[in-house]
Amino acid sequence: MALKKRSKHSKKFKLNLGPQHPATHGVLRLILEMDGEIVERADPHIGLLHRGTEKLIEYKTYLQAIPYFDRLDYVSPMCQEHAFALAIEHLLKCEVPLRAQYIRVMFSELTRILNHTLNIATQALDVGATTPLLWMFEEREKIMEFYERVSGSRLHANYFRPGGVSQDLPEGLIENIADFCEQFPCKIADLETLLTDNRIWKQRTVDIGIVSKQQAMDWGFSGVMLRGSGIAWDLRKSQPYDQYANLDFDVAIGKNGDCYDRYLIRIEEMYQSIKIIKQCIQKMPAGEIRTQDPSISPPKRSEIKKSMEALINHFKLYSEGYNVPAGEVYAAVEAPKGEFGVYLYSDGTNRPYRCRIKAPGFAHLQGLDFMARGHSLSDIITIIATLDIVFGEIDR
């Protein structure tokens, strides 16, 4: 078969994008095969942030393993703690108090806002708009303050626990979160004023990185990447956990499967998160914030000061941990980036025999090649941003 005759003016070459590049959203190395300005192939090279998290977890007790999950997707840490806590609770068959469930849902939705504000702000920055970044970081600061007040940390919260949460909400926090819910929709509206009908923004996002329904399912996409293609799949609705089944909210889906649709879905999800948080505040009862089973939950400080048995129990839980019944379970949550899952295999000891982590960004990055083909180099930056990738969870 005769080879296709190439024009003497055409020039094909390979371009290395990253890993030290701000628009790759982490340590992504992309080898792009270019025909002039057009991308013919995109080959992602990952593993530069690999820390062996899954293996490290095997050497820790179930309680000691929780902080590792904050360091996976470090933009939305509490949602990953949530998945690990649910997996352990399934094996332990322990009941989570109602107040703790509402607290976990509320902070999961605050985490969703934390994630989406950063994604939209950095995506706008990548295409040349700087104002959204400044506006959204101001809002993120407020949520990080809520994190700090409830857990002592702005980022790596280590707040969720098997059976509940580590401590109750401090005085005045619930009122401050309610105030935030009243003013934040106006900030989203301001952001939409800047971007949604902006013709430059639409030129950079409409019909860029199109993913069909079939492609989204074939590549194992989830979250916004799946709903952007018109598939209404959200684990909070389809496989509800904690109190999501008792909360009223809508699932936003797109029509065209392009970067613009995915941006609109993230905007709508922030509105829905505010709606969920308001319901959590209204419905949250008084009561315990973690299970009262002494074999799982450490005693209160007031008890430790009065009872030697409580002190011994506290010491044993934090040093030796507790044994989890033998078995295996897969627990997944609707994290901001998609379905974050934890497969946990217990051999009946105080440490996981195996912990397999399913990160949504890993599947999404695999689809970069087919999404990028035929687009210009500048469009690749937009596609990387719309994938919403963080290499803590991809490389693990």
From Swiss-Prot:
Pfam families: Complex1_49kDa
Gene3D superfamilies: Cytochrome-c3 Hydrogenase, chain B
Record organism: Orientia tsutsugamushi (strain Ikeda) (Rickettsia tsutsugamushi)
GO cellular component, one term: plasma membrane
UniProt EC number: 7.1.1.-
Matches recorded under NCBIfam families: NuoD, PRK06075.1
Chain's gene name: nuoD
Biological role: NDH-1 shuttles electrons from NADH, via FMN and iron-sulfur (Fe-S) centers, to quinones in the respiratory chain. The immediate electron acceptor for the enzyme in this species is believed to be ubiquinone. Couples the redox reaction to proton translocation (for every two electrons transferred, four hydrogen ions are translocated across the cytoplasmic membrane), and thus conserves the redox energy in a proton gradient.
Family stated for the protein in its record: Belongs to the complex I 49 kDa subunit family.
Signal peptide: none
Name the UniProt record assigns to this protein: NADH-quinone oxidoreductase subunit D
Upper lineage: Bacteria, Pseudomonadati, Pseudomonadota, Alphaproteobacteria, Rickettsiales
Protein topology in the membrane: Peripheral membrane protein
